[in-house]
Amino acid sequence: MDELNTLSWVLLGLGALVVGLSKTALPGAGTLAVVLFATALPARESTAGLLVLLIVGDLFAVWMYRHTVDWAILRRLIWPVLAGIAVGSVFLGLASDDAVRRVIGAILLTLLAFTLWRRRRGSTMKPGRLAGYGFGWLGGFTTMVANAGGPVMSLYLLGMRLDVKTFLGTAAYFFFAINLFKVPFQIGLGLLDLQMLSIVAVLVPLVVVAAFAGRWLASRIPQRAFEALVLVLTAVGALNLLI
């Protein structure tokens, strides 16, 4: 990989700040970090660098929201998510960068349209067990191929009608476990090496600062505004992946 220029470092720094905020306040914003990293680095390699920063953010989110977790939801998602990760690792090894971005973008827009349709109808029904399996599989697949599982799971958790802190706590534990599970796959694909780790080390402080800022924000944001932000950020991230 070539030496990074000033613009690349700026994009990576912004991406690191987005990671911290997405973990403790704004789920769905993480897709913007995917775009920023993929712009600054080769797309496939960027997934490895971003993964390490996501794990750093996960550590803070797990600590901050350790008392507000819906464990029943997490147990339901385990096996479909693992299946999605397995399929995603094969796809990542075979697909081009453009194919990865477009597939994820198309999936997100489809799920977003379905979510908005349900909300427009005023449906108060929570997603059933079968829907949970489907979202779990898609969450595992998208998080493996592009670190873009956040929006998928955000849409699922919105449907479960969780309050802000339970939403963030459940998402924190989910992604901490999943991101750790992905590390051996990234190493096996040759994407996570010492050069990438040296780049990531410079960015870690930005994730930490943004994570604490996000914690402050999450305690002050109203439920309806939180849900609207999740939907808007998901849409923006999906469109960026398709462009």
Residue ranges and their predicted role:
Residues D58-T68, S89, V103-G128, R215-W216, ...:
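Transmembrane helix exit motif
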